[in-house]
Design a protein with these regions (language model features):
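C-terminal structural segment of proteins
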Residues: 1-142
Length: 142
């Protein structure tokens, strides 16, 4: 990049592939700005399934639920080439979650097939929203 001036990148564009970001050699992430309106009154949780021997994630799901509006947002990573935001206007059904995967390509490697990663991602999404909607808390890692 010409010059050393700070620049801004949207969170959705930051990670480009597994273990790859938009940062160039020598660049350092110095600041993350999250608007307060993006944090409250959302309730959130984090779910992760990993290969225990290696510690690599099969799937990561961050769920955000807005109790007043019933909106739901899922940040999905680990199972896809780069993280994705999946949004719903109301608590989704199992079928709606499955349909949200249309057009997404799940990773297939020595840690898990694409079908396995898709299944685990869906299970973590379902568990995350069930816990938030019922105000309970389950395990974060499986």
């Amino acid at each position: 990049r010409p010059g050393d001036d700070p620049y801004f990148v949207d969170a959705a564009d930051f990670q480009t592939a597994p273990q790859q970001t938009v940062l160039q050699p020598g660049e350092v992430l110095c600041n993350i700005k999250i608007p307060r309106s993006s944090l409250t009154p959302w309730r959130t949780n984090f779910k992760r399934m990993a290969v225990c021997t290696a510690g690599y994630a099969i799937a990561i799901v961050v769920t955000a639920y807005h109790p007043q509006t019933q909106q739901v947002r899922f940040g999905v990573g680990g199972s896809l080439q780069s993280p994705q935001l999946i949004e719903f206007d109301a608590i989704p059904t199992v079928e709606q979650i499955a349909a949200s995967f249309q057009g997404l390509t799940f990773l297939h490697d020595e840690r898990g097939s694409a079908a396995y990663r898709q299944h685990i991602t869906q299970v973590l999404m379902q568990r995350g929203i069930a816990e938030l909607a019922s105000e309970t808390e389950g395990p974060r890692r499986y």
